[in-house]
């Protein structure tokens, strides 16, 4: 165990947990990194002193926690509040007559489709020589003969 060292004048005391570590952030996590262990023999010494894997993982955690906290704060700042205006009942729109509107739409579509189908229809083509046959019949029967065969409509006595 390390002996507690006295605080220097330039240091500020940070809140610590029961194991002597500063809190990572205000949210509780179900996991924590292990405290740094003394470096094994043959460990590299850097300008900042010996580095252990658990110390690096703690520093990485602290950095990631800072990044996550900054990003969540930034997201909260960008969040917009949405309030729906209250409409007085006198200005509220009347409920539409959905069934009648659907029936009207259906009948309109149906009539337009029927008109399109009728417009696309054409008379069937006459068989070869059919036109000549019709002209011959009209000539033989004569235009006046057809009129002679017509009957007069009955007269109404109302």
From Swiss-Prot:
What is written about domains in the entry's comments? The GoLoco 1 and/or GoLoco 3 domains exhibit GDI activity towards GDP-bound G(i) alpha protein, but not the GoLoco 2 domain.
Q: Where is this region: Disordered?
A: 1-53, 78-97
Q: Which Pfam families does this one have?
A: GoLoco
In terms of InterPro entries, this protein maps to: GoLoco_motif (IPR003109), GPSM3 (IPR042888), TPR-like_helical_dom_sf (IPR011990)
**Predominant location:** cytoplasm
Record keyword Acetylation present? no
Residue ranges, compositional bias (Low complexity): 43-53
Q: Which residues carry this modification: Phosphothreonine?
A: 60
* Chain positions with Phosphoserine modification: 33, 37, 54, 57
Q: Which PANTHER family match?
A: G-PROTEIN SIGNALING MODULATOR 3, G-PROTEIN-SIGNALING MODULATOR 3
Subcellular locations according to the entry: Cytoplasm
Q: Which UniProt keywords apply?
A: Cytoplasm, Phosphoprotein, Repeat
Q: Where is the GoLoco domain?
A: 60-82, 102-124, 130-153
Sample GO molecular function, one term:
GTPase regulator activity
Q: Please give the name of this protein.
A: G-protein-signaling modulator 3
Which portions of the chain have biased composition (kind: Pro residues)? Answer: 33-42, 86-96
């Amino acid at each position: 165990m390390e002996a507690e060292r006295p605080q220097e004048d330039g240091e500020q005391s940070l809140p610590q947990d029961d194991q002597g570590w500063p809190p990572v952030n205000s949210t509780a996590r179900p996991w924590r990194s292990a405290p740094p262990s003394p470096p094994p023999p043959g460990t590299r010494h850097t300008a900042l002193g010996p580095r252990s894997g658990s110390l690096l993982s703690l520093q990485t955690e602290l950095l990631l926690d800072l990044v996550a906290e900054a990003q969540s704060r930034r997201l909260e700042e960008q969040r917009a509040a949405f309030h729906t205006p209250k409409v007085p009942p006198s200005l509220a729109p009347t409920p539409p007559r959905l069934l009648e509107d659907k029936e009207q739409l259906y009948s309109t579509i149906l009539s337009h489709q029927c008109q399109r189908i009728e417009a696309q229809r054409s008379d069937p083509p006459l068989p070869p020589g059919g036109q000549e046959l019709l002209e011959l019949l009209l000539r033989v029967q004569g235009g006046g003969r057809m009129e002679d065969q017509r009957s007069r409509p009955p007269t109404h006595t109302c």
